[in-house]
């Protein structure tokens, strides 16, 4: 078998008949499969052992040779080679066809490659192939030209003979008529009898004339057809063709069926045709030029490759190995077989019948019919259902052909090559394991025993608990006592991988150290639930076991959960306290003035209370019941660093780091701060979820990951402990309805009645009434919400949950205790009657009914969203899978400018710097492309420095507003990106490693939150067209589609002339440079004019006489990215796409770094359309990689030629995926047959650069530790190491002392030996 590690590229091409015969181990001659009595394969049949190899290892068919000692012998009786049975998986056979057939992919695919090659319309080609028309394959023009006059004379003679014969016949008939009439007259016959005879005679004469005219017309048609006869001409009329063959057979040849196509291909001159087509492209216009371009693609493909076009017509059909189309016996003696066997049987049956008919010399019509049936059966074998009705099996089910085996989700590519089942794995329900450390998981004993079975068995033998592996296996299966001790030893420090489906991003698989637990459920650490998106309502997880030392090392170093605290999408921590833990820490750090033991200053009669010399003393007081954990106290601290603002004051008073200081805080906060690492400033705040998140964020920036992991573990333990101690419970008594609710609703009800009256009087129309009511009831709902918040006491547990950030929000509390408010109908519009009841009071029947619309839509949306989001992720992964960090620095000077702050002038005229809201996702974690300097030109941060939070703060403090940073958009690495342009890896907080699969991480980061995005297109008040939002908008942007209701953009800078019609606007821009006016016609008024800031600082819609800049949007809506590219160029379209995608995600509160979106956008803009090919090899109109385009142009210019001209093109992600260089990757994505057809014709070679290609062929992927840079490392010893390994003694060494020993590697002193014995 082929070893995948020994080849570097994979080429696909067309196989000739000789290739097929060379692959084959014998011809399949019979349609038989297995003998139903002996259950052995039939000789020369589809499962024949002689062709495909023995069914049993080392045993021939007749049983003469058995056992391995006869290896390689071919049995003289049955002809079977004695070898392993597994050769039946790789040996192919073939069927020798009695007549050639065309390959359906090349004839029926769109576009028809055969049609383009031969310049025949697919309809005509079909007529030829399926025996409905003859085609002229060759014409001897010279001979015809030379003999044309002779032939014409002959034809004229024949025509004259026909005419003479006609005249003679007519003359004779006329005479006979005269004689008959004369006779009748003599007999005195009546006039009507005479008339009848005359009519009869004239009719016969007319028929004679018609017959001879038809004969003359036929001769004319034959002659005309013959004189105009040209190759590739179709003749549908069989009689005409036969006549032509009989008369002029020596001047031309013609045929029908695949034989005709084969002859046409054999006579085809590729070079001459290519030259003609190039000439047509140079001089032609319109459709003619387009068709020539398309044809040239196919012709050039054959011209530039080793392929012969003859491969599209088959003389032999390969038969795939029998083990790949098995036949198995079921209970009850029936057989289940692969559909392919049925399809092969049809081909063999028809082929054998055709051979017999040809041998018998059957009439041509019968033979042609059989040939057509053979063609159809081969079509069905290759691609059933592509032409005509599919061949069906039992129960009218279409049979699965070879193409169907490759296509779709169940096809070979996606089902078996890109996703395989894995051994050493298990799955079980998950339960929470709060006692675990962050890097641990609980593994059920029985599952661990099964997973680690081989390891346990080996260890049992090593420790002499068992004599051999067999007895060790028995011990494990019987679960002897020693087994458990050995299992404990074996699993120590052997990480396992846990995976929860769906694995939406890379944190869906993480490594943990297993801890054995009782029961059958896997225990999961509560902090990793966020990354897995797991909860404990019945979720299941799979466990996988890394076996080799390398796999274990990768799992431990790269995948251990404590090393994956940060989100790869935003670089912010994911392993953060949630839910109960947040509640516990919030409770712990709350301050309640006047609680038990609270600090009180010294009075007249009483000493100062609530002052403690150390945290230990305060804890003792709490244990005694003299102090509440939430009471404000003063306590002397030595271990913790004071907060920054306190520290500044203390320094002024002569305090030194390490001295004690007094904090005014609560015991809870002191306990909380003891959980934080040493040296972290004291946090004297109530711990809302956001504050906790900011602290962990800060820890991740400042401390090593191991410290962060230990800290979040401590926070988890404290959170659970204090959540339990807090006793937060929720009951009906806690749901308090605000007493002002009735009064508020009455007030707004009167307001609504007023609107109704105005509507009744006709003062308002339907839409205005609706809008007014919606506004009124929204205000009412908000007011009830406010009243509710004021009414709830601070210690109410229901409001504690949203306030602490643990779960829920105040809207849900409002629904529970206030009022539900307005709901939408199925169209997504507000129903103007609100739901006035709260869930506590209960809804009326009508309220309940209208509420169900929204609830049902929500569920339907979620289901649709999940599928759409998954598909989007799949396309994103496919387009970006070969973006891998290939080198440290590409050396480019280019970069992009990013705004980090904006200058704003206040009312007092002072300029203040406002930090940019999106700094987290734009400038953060990037590398500087140029020195960042302040106003005086001092360098603040040097080029090549990483922009972390401290560096950004420094720049903001110095008043810097814009920085130039490196970006993947400007990276010049050939394939993939360089580490400096990519910047910091969001998941590790350090510069990205070489080998990181940046593209896949980007795709996952964008796809994973996809499910959270909304589906619906929302109505904006009064706008007729819906504005697309949510997931459909992201898809629309990445697919580079023209948006729905697109807004025009200004092509030039100039003044606007606005004309308003009844339903449309007409905008004309008069350019500043005096160029031609640009007119935008028929702009719907429903779309509204764009509102923007004008020169005078006001914000208003576009008006007549306004000045617009190039690229400015003129109407509301979304701009077309293709227009932006055309008008503004590639850089602006990149900015546009990144901002528009971020707009959608930000609206849902999802944080994704710009660099991920940039990776995808870079892939969309990778190609160039060739406008003029110059002296290059490119075809005009073809798409090519920008890097290839530039390198080819450099080569041509160096040789003194004309470079090609091209323009950048924006491709949607699906199109870009299919246009990838790797045919394996494209075929496994979509449109498998089309991609393979194209790749085979072009004889495409796959360099195996991406990830999918390598997964498919089973090689290590060229990313991470599989990248060549790491695989090709060899150890070079240093000089010191070499000296230590190979010591050469000097003469002073003790080796030359009298006790000189052997085997020291020293020189032998020959003079000390006597040689007398040897002489």
Curated annotation (Swiss-Prot):
One of its GO terms (biological process) is DNA-templated transcription. Zn(2+) 2 binds at residues 890, 971, 978, 981. It comes from the Bacteria. Keywords: DNA-directed RNA polymerase, Magnesium, Metal-binding, Nucleotidyltransferase, Transcription, Transferase, Zinc. GO terms for molecular function: DNA binding; DNA-directed RNA polymerase activity; magnesium ion binding; zinc ion binding. Its EC number is 2.7.7.6. Zn(2+) 1 binds at residues 60, 62, 75, 78. Mg(2+) binds at residues 535, 537, 539. One of its GO terms (cellular component) is DNA-directed RNA polymerase complex. Binds 1 Mg(2+) ion per subunit. Binds 2 Zn(2+) ions per subunit. Its cofactor is Mg(2+); Zn(2+). InterPro entries: DNA-dir_RpoC_beta_prime, DNA-dir_RpoC_beta_prime_bact, RNA_pol_asu, RNA_pol_N, RNA_pol_Rpb1_1, RNA_pol_Rpb1_3, RNA_pol_Rpb1_3_sf, RNA_pol_Rpb1_4. Pfam families: RNA_pol_Rpb1_1 (PF04997), RNA_pol_Rpb1_2 (PF00623), RNA_pol_Rpb1_3 (PF04983), RNA_pol_Rpb1_4 (PF05000), RNA_pol_Rpb1_5 (PF04998). DNA-dependent RNA polymerase catalyzes the transcription of DNA into RNA using the four ribonucleoside triphosphates as substrates. The RNAP catalytic core consists of 2 alpha, 1 beta, 1 beta' and 1 omega subunit. When a sigma factor is associated with the core the holoenzyme is formed, which can initiate transcription. Belongs to the RNA polymerase beta' chain family. HAMAP family: RNApol_bact_RpoC. This is DNA-directed RNA polymerase subunit beta'.
């Amino acid at each position: 078998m082929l070893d995948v590690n020994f080849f570097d590229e994979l080429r696909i091409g067309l196989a000739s008949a000789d290739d097929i015969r060379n692959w084959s181990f014998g011809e399949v001659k019979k349609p038989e499969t297995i003998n139903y009595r002996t259950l052995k394969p039939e000789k020369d049949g589809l499962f024949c052992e002689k062709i495909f190899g023995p069914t049993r290892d080392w045993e021939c068919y007749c049983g003469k040779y058995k056992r391995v000692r006869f290896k390689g012998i071919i049995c003289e009786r049955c002809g079977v080679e004695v070898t392993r049975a597994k050769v039946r998986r790789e040996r192919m056979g073939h069927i020798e066809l009695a007549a050639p057939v065309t390959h359906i992919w090349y004839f029926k695919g769109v576009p028809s490659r055969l049609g383009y090659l031969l310049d025949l319309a697919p309809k005509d080609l079909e007529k030829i192939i399926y025996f409905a028309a003859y085609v002229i394959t060759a014409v001897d023009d010279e001979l015809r030209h030379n003999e044309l006059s002779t032939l014409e004379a002959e034809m004229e003679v024949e025509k004259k003979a026909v005419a003479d014969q006609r005249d003679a016949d007519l003359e004779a008939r006329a005479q006979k008529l005269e004689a008959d009439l004369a006779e009748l007259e003599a007999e005195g016959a009546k006039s009507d009898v005479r008339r009848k005879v005359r009519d009869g005679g004239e009719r016969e004469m007319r028929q004679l004339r018609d017959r001879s005219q038809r004969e003359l017309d036929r001769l004319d048609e034959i002659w005309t057809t013959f004189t105009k006869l040209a190759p590739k001409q179709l003749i549908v009329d069989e009689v005409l063709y036969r006549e032509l063959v009989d008369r002029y057979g020596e001047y031309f040849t013609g045929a029908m069926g695949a034989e005709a196509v084969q002859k046409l291909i054999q006579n085809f001159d590729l070079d001459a045709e290519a030259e003609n087509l190039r000439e047509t492209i140079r001089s032609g216009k319109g459709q003619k030029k387009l068709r020539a371009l398309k044809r040239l693609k196919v012709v050039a493909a054959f011209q530039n490759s080793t392929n012969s076009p003859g491969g599209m017509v088959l003389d032999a059909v390969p038969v795939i190995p029998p083990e790949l189309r098995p036949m198995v016996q079921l209970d009850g003696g029936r057989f289940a077989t692969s559909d392919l066997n049925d399809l092969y049987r049809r081909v063999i049956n028809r082929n054998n019948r055709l051979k017999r008919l040809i041998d018998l010399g059957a009439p041509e019509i019968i033979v042609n019919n059989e040939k057509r049936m053979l063609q159809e059966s081969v079509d069905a074998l290759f691609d059933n259902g592509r032409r005509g009705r599919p061949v069906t099996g039992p129960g009218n089910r279409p049979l699965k052909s070879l193409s169907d085996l490759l296509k779709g989700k169940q096809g070979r590519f996606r089902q078996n090559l890109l996703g395989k089942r894995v051994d050493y794995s298990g799955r079980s329900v998950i339960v929470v394991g709060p006692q675990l450390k962050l890097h641990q998981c609980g593994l059920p004993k029985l599952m661990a025993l099964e997973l680690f079975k081989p390891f346990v068995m080996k260890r049992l033998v090593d420790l002499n608990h068992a004599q051999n592996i067999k007895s060790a296996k028995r011990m494990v299966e019987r679960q002897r006592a020693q087994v458990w001790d050995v299992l404990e030893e074996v699993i120590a420090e052997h990480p396992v991988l846990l995976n929860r489906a769906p694995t939406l991003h890379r944190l869906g698989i993480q490594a943990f150290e297993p801890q054995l637990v009782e029961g059958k459920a896997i225990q999961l650490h509560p902090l990793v639930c966020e990354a897995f998106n797991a909860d404990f309502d019945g979720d299941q997880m799979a466990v996988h076991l890394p076996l080799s030392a390398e796999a274990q090392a990768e799992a431990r170093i790269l995948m251990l959960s404590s090393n994956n605290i940060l989100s790869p999408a935003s670089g912010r921590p994911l392993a953060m306290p949630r839910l109960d833990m947040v509640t516990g820490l919030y409770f712990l750090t709350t301050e309640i003035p006047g609680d038990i033991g609270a600090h009180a200053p010294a009075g007249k009669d009483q000493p100062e209370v609530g002052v403690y010399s150390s945290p230990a003393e305060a804890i003792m007081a709490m244990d005694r019941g003299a102090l509440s954990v939430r009471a404000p106290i003063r306590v002397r601290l030595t271990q913790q660093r004071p907060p920054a603002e306190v520290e500044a004051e203390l320094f002024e008073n002569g305090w030194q780091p390490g001295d004690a200081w007094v904090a005014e805080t609560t015991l809870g906060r002191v306990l909380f701060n003891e959980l934080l690492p040493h040296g972290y400033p004291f946090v004297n705040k109530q711990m809302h979820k956001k504050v906790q998140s900011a602290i962990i964020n800060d820890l991740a920036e400042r401390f090593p990951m191991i410290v962060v992991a230990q800290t979040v573990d401590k926070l988890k333990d404290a959170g659970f402990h204090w959540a339990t101690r807090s006793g937060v419970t929720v009951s009906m008594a806690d749901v308090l309805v605000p007493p002002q609710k009735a009064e508020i609703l009455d007030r707004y009800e009167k307001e609504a009645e007023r609107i109704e009256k105005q509507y009744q009087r006709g003062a308002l129309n339907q839409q205005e009434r609706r809008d007014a009511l919606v506004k009124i009831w929204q205000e009412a709902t908000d007011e009830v919400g406010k009243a509710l918040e004021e009414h709830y006491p601070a210690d109410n547990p229901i409001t504690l949950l949203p306030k602490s950030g643990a779960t829920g929000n105040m809207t849900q509390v409002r629904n529970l205790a206030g009022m539900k408010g307005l709901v939408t109908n199925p169209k997504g519009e507000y129903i103007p009657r609100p739901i006035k009841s709260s869930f506590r009071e209960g809804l009326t029947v009508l309220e309940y009914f209208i509420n169900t619309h929204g609830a049902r839509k929500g569920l339907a949306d979620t289901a649709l969203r999940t599928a759409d989001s998954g598909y989007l992720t799949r396309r994103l992964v496919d387009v970006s899978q070969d973006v891998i960090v290939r080198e440290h620095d590409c050396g480019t000077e280019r970069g992009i400018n990013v705004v980090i702050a904006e200058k704003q002038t206040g009312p007092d005229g002072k300029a203040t710097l406002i930090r940019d809201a999106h700094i987290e996702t734009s400038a953060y974690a990037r590398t500087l492309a140029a020195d960042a300097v302040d106003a005086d030109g001092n360098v603040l941060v040097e080029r090549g420095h990483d922009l972390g939070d401290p560096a950004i703060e420094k720049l903001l403090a110095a008043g810097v507003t814009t920085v130039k940073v490196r970006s993947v958009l400007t990276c010049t690495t050939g394939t993939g990106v360089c580490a400096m342009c990519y910047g910091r890896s969001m998941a590790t907080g350090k510069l990205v490693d070489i080998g990181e699969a940046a593209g896949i991480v980007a795709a996952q980061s964008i796809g994973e939150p996809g499910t959270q995005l909304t589906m619906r297109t929302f109505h904006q008040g009064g706008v007729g067209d819906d504005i697309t939002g949510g997931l459909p908008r992201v898809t629309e942007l990445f697919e580079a589609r023209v948006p729905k209701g697109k807004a025009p953009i200004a092509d030039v800078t100039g003044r606007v002339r606005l004309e308003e019609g009844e339903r449309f606007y007409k905008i004309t821009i008069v350019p500043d440079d005096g160029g031609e006016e640009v007119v935008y016609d028929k702009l719907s008024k429903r779309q509204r004019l764009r509102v923007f800031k004008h020169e005078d600082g006001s914000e208003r819609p576009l008006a007549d006489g306004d000045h617009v800049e190039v690229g400015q949007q003129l109407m509301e809506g979304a701009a077309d990215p293709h227009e932006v590219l055309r008008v503004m160029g590639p850089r602006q379209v990149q900015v546009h796409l990144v901002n528009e995608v971020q707009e959608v995600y930000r609206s849902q509160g999802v944080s994704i770094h710009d660099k991920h979106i940039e990776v995808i956008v870079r892939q969309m803009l990778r190609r160039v359309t060739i406008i003029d090919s110059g002296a290059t090899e490119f075809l005009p109109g073809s798409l090519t990689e920008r890097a290839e385009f530039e390198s080819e142009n450099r080569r041509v210019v160096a040789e003194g030629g004309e470079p090609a001209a091209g323009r950048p093109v924006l491709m949607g992600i699906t199109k870009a995926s299919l246009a990838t260089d790797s045919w394996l990757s494209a075929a496994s994505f979509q449109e498998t047959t089309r991609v393979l057809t194209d790749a085979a014709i072009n004889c495409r070679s796959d360099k195996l650069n991406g990830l999918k290609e390598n997964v498919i062929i089973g090689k290590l992927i060229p990313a991470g530790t599989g990248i060549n840079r790491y695989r090709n490392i060899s150890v070079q010893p240093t000089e010191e190491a070499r000296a230590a390994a190979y010591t050469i003694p000097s003469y002073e060494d003790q080796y030359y002392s009298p006790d000189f020993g052997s085997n020291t590697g020293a020189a032998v002193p020959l003079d000390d030996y006597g040689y007398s014995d040897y002489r």
